[in-house]
């Protein structure tokens, strides 16, 4: 009987022990979870308090920065703006230092916009000054170029005037030499003509050549009481200064050719291209009028 009770009691005791162990483990687990939950709540409260403190510190820092910016804006306005603008910005700075939250941000934005407009005005002013300086430099360069061109033109005019004066002087000297060379021989002595007589004789010399069209140089010299060589020299001088135009052939004749006839001959040569002396001589009879003006007048 005792043995039976023993075998019955042992399993029951084992079951009770196992149950007690499980209950104790669950209790410890519940206690651990409870401790973790309490710890999490504590950490949450600490974080919330830290966030609140951080927010307060940030607000204080923003307020401090707003005060500094307001003071700086006031000092800058006092240096650059008019008294009215200084007063306005001072009032804005005072309001900014007292404003908080959304109202303070709005005032800060307004002040920043005003500063941005001022910076834009300064940039536009600097740009206008730069354009003005550039325009002044361009005008200065243009004035220098104009002055240089005027100097060059003046020098060129002076050179042309000097060359013209020299040419006129040279022509005058040649004319005087030619005029003084005409002399008449009377009783074996050469008497110098007056200026008017020399000029008249020169014009008569030229007109005689034009009227004859073709004249022997010996006859020309004899007609004016000159030596043949002197007549040739005077004729060459007249050809050089353009008083008459023509050619001296190899037979001692001078053929007077008008400028118009010269142009006709030149056109004939250009049309033919290559022209021989024979062809030119044959064509000259039709291109150049060789009939004396005296005969034509008659």
From Swiss-Prot:
The lineage of its organism: Eukaryota, Metazoa, Chordata, Craniata, Vertebrata. Residues 110-149 have a biased composition (Basic and acidic residues). The UFM1-interacting motif (UFIM) specifically recognizes and binds ufmylated RPL26/uL24, resulting in stable association between the 60S ribosome and the UREL complex. Component of the UFM1 ribosome E3 ligase (UREL) complex, composed of ufl1, ddrgk1 and cdk5rap3. Residues 71-149 are annotated as: Disordered. It comes from Osmerus mordax. It holds the Pfam family DDRGK. A motif (UFM1-interacting motif (UFIM)) lies at residues 181-195. One of its GO terms (biological process) is protein ufmylation. This is DDRGK domain-containing protein 1. Belongs to the DDRGK1 family. Residues 215-259 form the PCI domain. Residues 82-94 have a biased composition (Acidic residues). One of its GO terms (molecular function) is UFM1-modified protein reader activity.
């Amino acid at each position: 009987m005792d043995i039976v009770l023993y075998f019955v009691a042992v399993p029951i005791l084992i079951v009770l022990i196992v149950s007690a162990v499980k209950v104790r483990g669950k209790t410890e687990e519940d206690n651990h979870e409870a401790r973790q939950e309490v710890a999490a709540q504590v950490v949450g409260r600490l974080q919330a308090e830290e966030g609140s403190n951080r927010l307060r510190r940030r607000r204080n820092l923003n307020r401090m920065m707003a005060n500094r910016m307001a003071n700086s804006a006031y000092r800058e306005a006092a240096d650059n703006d008019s008294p009215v603008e200084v007063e306005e910005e001072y009032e804005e700075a005072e309001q900014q230092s007292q404003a908080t939250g959304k109202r303070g941000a709005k005032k800060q934005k307004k002040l920043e916009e005003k500063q941005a407009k001022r910076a834009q005005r300064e940039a536009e002013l600097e740009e206008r000054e730069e354009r003005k300086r550039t325009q002044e430099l361009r005008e200065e360069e243009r004035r220098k170029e104009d002055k240089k061109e005027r100097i060059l033109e003046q020098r060129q005019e002076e050179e042309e005037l000097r060359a013209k004066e020299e040419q006129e002087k040279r022509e005058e000297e040649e004319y005087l030499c030619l005029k003084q060379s005409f002399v008449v021989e009377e009783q074996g002595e050469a008497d110098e003509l007056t200026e008017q007589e020399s000029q008249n004789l020169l014009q008569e010399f030229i007109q005689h050549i034009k009227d004859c069209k073709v004249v022997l140089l010996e006859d020309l010299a004899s007609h004016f009481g000159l030596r043949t060589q002197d007549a040739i020299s005077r004729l060459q001088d007249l050809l050089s200064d353009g008083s008459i135009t023509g050619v001296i052939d190899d037979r001692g004749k001078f053929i007077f050719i008008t400028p118009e006839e010269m142009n006709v001959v030149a056109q004939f040569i250009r049309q033919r291209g290559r022209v021989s002396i024979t062809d030119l001589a044959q064509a000259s009879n039709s291109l150049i009028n060789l009939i004396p003006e005296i005969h034509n007048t008659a």
